[in-house]
């Protein structure tokens, strides 16, 4: 009895303290609201102008797109209407190539071999961990929801699929890592093509009566052959930046410059200036981004197929993918960030809002890269040495959303075909989906191409990819947003884990963060500081 009586006052005291804390916070909030002035509102709107304009563009673009759908615009009219959005894509893609090279070279050159090795290892561990988690989430969700019930006969097909073997796709990945021509790597990627070739194969005789006849004819005609056709792999290429090859070269080049010490100072300063110039161009383009995103989204909504095409199975498949991506993006990634850094992930994500909306509009993690740099460095204060190293690599190989989508889509196609997958085949899908997501370049709808590898690994029909193309334009935007979020949170995690190495590097270089900020101050501010110091000096002399 005494124990329970003793606990009641304690519980009452805790409740009173909790209520007092709530009252204090409420009063503080009321005072802040009452003290808000027009200048405060103006400063808030100015600070968050980019984000507010981008969010408004998404809302207006969606409304405009659905408003124009009943008018049944022609293909030419849609292209004219989407032209402002096309301009935004071209502007961003124009900056991707110099940004990847300059940021990686300067990032690697600013770190010593020990620090860059540790940072690289942490980034790779993060990439592999989140990708594997994404694949597991996709597999579990699609097995639980089971969107592929029924038959595929009534489902709408769209487009054609180019077949590629897993071995050739893997070899293409390795080949693209080491481009023979750096100039060509700026606009072309190696890709194995297939062509039919005819071969003459001698007919083998057996011991039967027919074999005896063939032997006699063969002796008379010297040889008897049959012609067979076979698909043979031949070297080829496709248009597009070979980002993987440029990333590998830039990392190696930056590492060498960093080890050259004073001899590499001129190159280090050149690439640092190039990176700064590119980021200033990004700052200009960001003002145009809301306009481009508005027309990109509106144009895609006008262009998309009739919603009646999306049947029950495809609708359930879409919902399943969205649920999987939400679990990974809203629960897993923020939780991982909180567990490692012990910081509020939503404050960090709030600083990324414009990059995430840009990813939603452009459906390309590479095209979003300039905006992602800007958000991480200016809004979230992530060290430039980390962003320059982690972001270009992440945009190339870290694609959580794509990995989740490929594993989920493969099992959905198996369900549609009433194909029972055993445990070994599910493991095979998880491994190939992880590997294929690494090989998927940061370009729109790359997941559809690499999904052929996943389906081939377990013997599923690759033609059935056409069943999901009708909704891929929408899902591609969602998984791109997830990819960008994963890269950005990864930069925050790697910076937190590498903070000691970064501080030690600052001490070694005699270039602390405070000194660096002082060097970057405008001339007028430095002059003002000097003027304020003069009276103090005169007083001391007196």
From Swiss-Prot:
The keyword Electron transport does not apply. The chain crosses the membrane at residues 48-68, 87-108, 123-145, 237-260, 270-297, 319-340, 386-412, 473-494. It is a multi-pass membrane protein. Na(+) 2 binds at residue 396. GO terms for biological process: auditory behavior; cell morphogenesis involved in neuron differentiation; cellular response to cocaine; chemical synaptic transmission; chloride transmembrane transport; cranial nerve development; D-aspartate import across plasma membrane; gamma-aminobutyric acid biosynthetic process. It is found in: Cell membrane. Disulfide bonds: none annotated. Detected in brain. Detected at very much lower levels in heart, lung, placenta and skeletal muscle. Highly expressed in cerebellum, but also found in frontal cortex, hippocampus and basal ganglia. The modification Phosphoserine is found at residue 512. Residues 346-376, 426-459 dip into the membrane without crossing it. Its main location: membrane. GO terms for molecular function: glutamate binding; glutamate:sodium symporter activity; high-affinity L-glutamate transmembrane transporter activity; L-glutamate transmembrane transporter activity; metal ion binding; neutral L-amino acid transmembrane transporter activity. InterPro entries: DAACS, Na-dicarboxylate_symporter, Na-dicarboxylate_symporter_CS, Na:dicarbo_symporter_sf. Glycosylated. Na(+) 1 binds at residues 394, 398, 483, 487. Residues 1-47, 109-122, 261-269, 341-345, 377-385, 495-542 are cytoplasmic. L-aspartate binds at residues 363-365, 402, 443-447, 476, 483. Keywords: Amino-acid transport, Cell membrane, Chloride, Disease variant, Glycoprotein, Membrane, Metal-binding, Phosphoprotein, Potassium, Sodium, Symport, Transmembrane, Transmembrane helix, Transport. It catalyses: K(+)(in) + L-glutamate(out) + 3 Na(+)(out) + H(+)(out) = K(+)(out) + L-glutamate(in) + 3 Na(+)(in) + H(+)(in); K(+)(in) + L-aspartate(out) + 3 Na(+)(out) + H(+)(out) = K(+)(out) + L-aspartate(in) + 3 Na(+)(in) + H(+)(in); D-aspartate(out) + K(+)(in) + 3 Na(+)(out) + H(+)(out) = D-aspartate(in) + K(+)(out) + 3 Na(+)(in) + H(+)(in). It holds the Pfam family SDF. Contains eight transmembrane regions plus two helical hairpins that dip into the membrane. These helical hairpin structures play an important role in the transport process. The first enters the membrane from the cytoplasmic side, the second one from the extracellular side. During the transport cycle, the regions involved in amino acid transport, and especially the helical hairpins, move vertically by about 15-18 Angstroms, alternating between exposure to the aqueous phase and reinsertion in the lipid bilayer. In contrast, the regions involved in trimerization do not move. Belongs to the dicarboxylate/amino acid:cation symporter (DAACS) (TC 2.A.23) family. SLC1A3 subfamily. Sodium-dependent, high-affinity amino acid transporter that mediates the uptake of L-glutamate and also L-aspartate and D-aspartate. Functions as a symporter that transports one amino acid molecule together with two or three Na(+) ions and one proton, in parallel with the counter-transport of one K(+) ion. Mediates Cl(-) flux that is not coupled to amino acid transport; this avoids the accumulation of negative charges due to aspartate and Na(+) symport. It is linked to Episodic ataxia 6: A disorder characterized by episodic ataxia, seizures, migraine and alternating hemiplegia. This is Excitatory amino acid transporter 1.
């Amino acid at each position: 009895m005494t124990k329970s009586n003793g606990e009641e006052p304690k519980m009452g005291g805790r409740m009173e303290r909790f209520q007092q804390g709530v009252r204090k916070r409420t009063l503080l909030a009321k005072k802040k609201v009452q003290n808000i002035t027009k200048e405060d509102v103006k400063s808030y709107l100015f600070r968050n102008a980019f984000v507010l304009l981008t969010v408004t563009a998404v809302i207006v673009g969606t409304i405009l797109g659905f408003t124009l759908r009943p008018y049944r615009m022609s293909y030419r009219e849609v292209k004219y209407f989407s032209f402002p959005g096309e301009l935004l894509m071209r502007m961003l893609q124009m900056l991707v190539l110099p940004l990847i090279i300059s940021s990686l070279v300067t990032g690697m050159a600013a770190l010593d071999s020990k620090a860059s090795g540790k940072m690289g290892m942490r980034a790779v561990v993060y990439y592999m961990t989140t990708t594997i988690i994404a694949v597991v989430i996709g597999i579990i969700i699609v097995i639980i929801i089971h969107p592929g019930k029924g038959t595929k006969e009534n489902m709408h097909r769209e487009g054609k699929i180019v077949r590629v073997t897993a071995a050739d796709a893997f070899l293409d990945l390795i080949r693209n890592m080491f481009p023979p021509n750096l100039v060509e790597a700026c606009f072309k990627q190696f890709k194995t093509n297939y062509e039919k070739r005819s071969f003459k194969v001698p007919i083998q005789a057996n011991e039967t009566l027919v074999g005896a006849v063939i032997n006699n004819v063969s002796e008379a005609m010297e040889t008897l052959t049959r012609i067979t056709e076979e698909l043979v792999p031949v070297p080829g290429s496709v248009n597009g930046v070979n980002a993987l090859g440029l990333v590998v070269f830039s990392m190696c080049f930056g590492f060498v410059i960093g080890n050259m010490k004073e001899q590499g100072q001129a190159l280090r300063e050149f690439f640092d200036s190039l990176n700064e110039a590119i980021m200033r161009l990004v700052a200009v383009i960001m003002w145009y981004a809301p306009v481009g995103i508005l027309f990109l989204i509106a144009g895609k909504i006008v262009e998309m197929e009739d919603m009646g095409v999306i049947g029950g199975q495809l609708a359930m498949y879409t919902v399943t993918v969205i649920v999987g991506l939400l679990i990974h993006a809203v629960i897993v990634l923020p939780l991982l960030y909180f567990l490692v850094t012990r910081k509020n992930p939503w404050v960090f994500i709030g600083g990324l809002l414009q990059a995430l909306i840009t990813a939603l509009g452009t459906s390309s993690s590479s095209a979003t890269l300039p905006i992602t740099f800007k958000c991480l460095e200016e809004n979230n204060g992530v060290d430039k040495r980390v962003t320059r190293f982690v972001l270009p690599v992440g945009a190339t190989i870290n694609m959580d959303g794509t990995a989740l989508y490929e594993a989920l889509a493969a099992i959905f196609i198996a369900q549609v075909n009433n194909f029972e997958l055993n445990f070994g085949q599910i493991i095979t899908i998880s491994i190939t989906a992880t590997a294929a997501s690494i090989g998927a370049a940061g370009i729109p709808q790359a997941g559809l191409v690499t999904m052929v590898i996943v389906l081939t690994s377990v013997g599923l029909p690759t033609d059935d990819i056409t069943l999901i193309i009708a909704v891929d334009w929408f899902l591609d935007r969602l998984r791109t947003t997830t990819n960008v979020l994963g890269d950005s949170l990864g930069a925050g995690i790697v910076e937190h884990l590498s903070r000691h190495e970064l501080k030690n590097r600052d001490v070694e270089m005699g270039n602390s963060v405070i000194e660096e900020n002082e060097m970057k101050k405008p001339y007028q501010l430095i002059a003002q500081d000097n003027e304020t110091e003069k009276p103090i000096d005169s007083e001391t002399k007196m």
